A protein has these predicted regions:
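Juxtamembrane helix-capping/reentrant segments at transmembrane boundaries
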Residues: 2-16, 65-69, 150
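Hydrophobic alpha-helical transmembrane segments
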Residues: 19, 23-150
Length: 150
């Protein structure tokens, strides 16, 4: 309607979160590419928690905290992962990465083989965790007065 306000900001953030979660969970439903639904749900939860830290800081008067793995970062990684998976499905491009060892398995959250969808989910999970921790530490510092407000 050409106007902005608190409701518009609220609606924008709500739709962003629904889309973020929807994309990651939809990837998890595609069992053809070996991404487990429970892994996708975990990645969606971590993504949501990272976003929550930014809005929670705003709710206690700090202003919106941005930083970490942003929505734009997640979207770029997800779109690139989808393109890569499409090329793999069409037989145009082959990516076969077999993960060995406990640490390697930990880094890719238990996926046995990586592909475009797996990359998107793993990056979303680790990015969500990184964002959650980064924003929490930033908000904590501002609330306790040890870090100037950015």
């Amino acid at each position: 309607q050409g106007t902005s306000g608190p409701y518009g900001d609220f609606l924008d953030h709500t739709i962003d979160r629904v889309v973020d979660i929807g994309l990651i969970v939809a990837i998890g439903f595609n069992s053809e590419f070996g991404v487990d639904l429970s892994l996708a749900l975990g990645a969606a939860l971590l993504t949501l928690m990272g976003s929550y830290m930014g809005t929670q800081a705003q709710s206690v008067g700090l202003g919106r905290i941005y930083g970490g793995f942003s929505r734009a970062d997640r979207m770029v990684i997800t779109v690139l992962g989808m393109i890569l998976a499409s090329l793999q499905a069409a037989g145009i491009f082959a990516l076969t990465v077999t993960i060995t060892g406990d640490f390697g398995s930990f880094l890719v959250l238990g996926l046995e083989e990586m592909n475009g969808f797996g990359i998107a989910v793993v990056f979303s999970a680790w990015g969500g965790m990184y964002t959650f921790i980064t924003r929490f530490i930033s908000a904590r510092g501002m609330l306790l007065g040890s870090v100037p407000e950015s």
